[in-house]
Amino acid sequence: MKFKGKSNIIKEVQSKLGLKADGIDGPATWKMIWENLIHEDKGEPEKPETPVQKLKDDYPEVYKASPNQSGPIKPKYVILHHSSGSHDGTRSWILNAASKVSYHYLIAADGSLTQFVYDKKRAWHAGRSSWKGVSGLNGHSIGISFYGDTNKRTPSAAEIDSAAKKCKYLMDKFNFGIDNILTHEMIAPNRKNDTSNETYQMVINRIKEL
C-alpha cells in the first residue's frame, strides 16, 4: 500500500483552503486550518443523548370506534385501569364485538393514545361497581387504561405523563376535582386489582404538578 508524502497531503489541504499549494506547513496554513476546519461549526455544541424519556405537551391521539359502547353519559369520574395484555392485543380486543369490553382511552408506551369511545358515550369498562353511593360507574365515568399488569410492570414516564394530562383535561372539561380520579380496584374492591397503588399515586402526583 502506498502512502502520500507529507508535502503532498499539505498541498491538498492548502488547495482546499484556497492557499498557494506549496507543500509548506507554515503559520498561514495552520491558521487557515484552525479557522476553517476546527472552528467551522459556529453553532451550539451538540448535547449528549439522555436515557430519560422526554415528556411532551401533547401526545398523539387517534380514534378507532369500538363496537362495545352505548350512551350517553355525564362524566364526573375517571377510572384508571390496566389490561393485563399487550398494547396491540388489548387494542384488538377492544375492537372485537365479542369481547364486550371497551375503554375510552388506551395509552401506549410512548404516551400516545387510542380513543375508542367518545367522552360523552358509555364505554364498558367498570362492570359491577360503586363509589360513595353511586353504582354502575360505566354511566358516570371515563375509562383510561394502561396496557399490561401495572402490579408487574411500571408504566413509563411518558405513560404516566400522558394519563395525568388526559385526566387534567377531563377534570377541566367536565368540572370535577382530583378526588374523582379513581382506580378500578377502588370501585370494585375484592373483584379487581387495577391499577397498582404505585401507578395511581404517580398519576395523582403528576396531575398536581400540572
Label the model's feature ranges.
Residues 1, 19-20, 92, 148-157:
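Second-shell loop/turn segments in exported
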Residues 135-143:
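Short coil-to-beta-strand
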Residues 31, 35-136:
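N-terminal catalytic cores of peptidoglycan-degrading enzymes
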Residues 25, 33-35, 40-61, 67, ...:
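Basic/polar, cationic surfaces and motifs that engage anionic cell-wall
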Residues 10, 105, 144, 163:
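Divalent metal-coordination and catalytic microenvironments
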Residues 1-41:
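A short amphipathic alpha-helical interaction element
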Residues 80, 144, 184:
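Conserved, mostly hydrophobic/aromatic
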